Amino acid sequence: MPYEKKAVHFGGGNIGRGFVAEFLHNSGYEVVFVDVMDSIIESLQKTSTYKVTEIGDDGEREFTIDHYRAINSKNEMDKVIEEIATADVVTCAVGPNILKFVAEPVAKAIEARKLDYPIAVIACENAINATTTWRGFIESKLSEETKKNIDSKARFANSAIDRIVPQQPPNAGLNVVIEKFHEWCVEQKPFENGGKKPDVKGIHYVDDLEPYIERKLFTVNTSHATAAYYGHQNKIAYIHEVLQDKKLHDIVRDAVKETANLIVKKHGVSTQEQSDYVEQIIKRISNPVLKDNVERVGRAPLRKLSRKERFIGPAAQLAERGESYQTLLGAVEQAYRFQNVEGDEESVELAKILKEHSPEEVVTKVNGIEKGHALFDPLVAIVKKVQGS
């Protein structure tokens, strides 16, 4: 069937296929996947459908995803540009570090765009204001003329996504198993005055995204990663098993008690509402049905230890406010101990950095915290401890 709406999505991974494409497909969009991985693109090109299975406490639901196309941007860049230039929406789920590599085709497509309405640009990443970051890379490749009239060609909206994609069963192919719970919040202001807001079932449009992003990142990601790093140190395989250990369960709860204090005081969320949210998250990550692997959740420790991320982001703000952040510091220590894990390049790089640099250099380089900040000395003490053991 011919589709009236088209979305181009960068990233053929599990989040792309199982979350973003599922929402777009169920809202009547033709989805065009773009990736550089030959195996994923070839599989998508050879297969006309794949299945998304949503799992939860109350059983499973299965969806079939079809009417998609796939392009390898490594050798068909012109085609990618043409698809974006004629699309309604362009999204990505590639990892925050890859945004700079998926900017050029979008910039060229914006330059070439002839449609009389702007394309919606939405990054679906686990990072604060990822679309703004992507926009910076895109605009650096635009002509001055296009930059001046950017609103007529493109609208950039930040988003917050929340959905756990556990380790997939072997031989799953393109099929994706994903948790039933989902939240996708998108700012609506960028679509005012001539913008075209994507009509996607399941997107929750909000005026101010920051409370949603910080609530999600500093609750879901903080609790998930805290469980993973403590679990790894205790040689536990799955997240739900970590949370079955009373001592570790209490540590995870204490970490999100500290971040809840920040969310309530900074964003004016009621204590009860945040407490209910925390309960919901602890229940989600404790779900044995997800069989969520500790090493999968812990991977990429350098990114997770960085300045705006799940530990240092809230801990720095709490330190600036003179509030408690001790449990978060404990989680930071465990994250620093996530070294040389098989299949995770960042954990190897982390071990190298700890070996070659002074504690002060490590804190500045890895955590992005400068001398003089209230968090600097406590972090230096943590790094010294890890280096000494």
Swiss-Prot record:
Protein's name according to its UniProt entry: Mannitol-1-phosphate 5-dehydrogenase
Recorded family membership: Belongs to the mannitol dehydrogenase family.
Catalysis: reaction(s): D-mannitol 1-phosphate + NAD(+) = beta-D-fructose 6-phosphate + NADH + H(+)
Keyword flag Oxidoreductase: yes
Coiled coil (UniProt feature): none
NCBIfam families linked: PRK02318.2-5
Residues that, per the record, bind NAD(+): A7, V8, H9, F10, G11, G12, G13, N14, I15, G16, R17, G18
Organism classification: Eukaryota, Fungi, Dikarya, Ascomycota, Pezizomycotina
Organism: Pyrenophora tritici-repentis (strain Pt-1C-BFP) (Wheat tan spot fungus)
Swiss-Prot/TrEMBL GO biological process terms: mannitol catabolic process
Keywords: NAD, Oxidoreductase
A single cellular component GO annotation: cytosol
Pfam families: Mannitol_dh, Mannitol_dh_C
Function description: Catalyzes the NAD(H)-dependent interconversion of D-fructose 6-phosphate and D-mannitol 1-phosphate in the mannitol metabolic pathway.
UniProt-annotated catalytic positions: K216
GO molecular function: mannitol-1-phosphate 5-dehydrogenase activity
Quaternary context: Monomer.
Listed EC numbers: 1.1.1.17
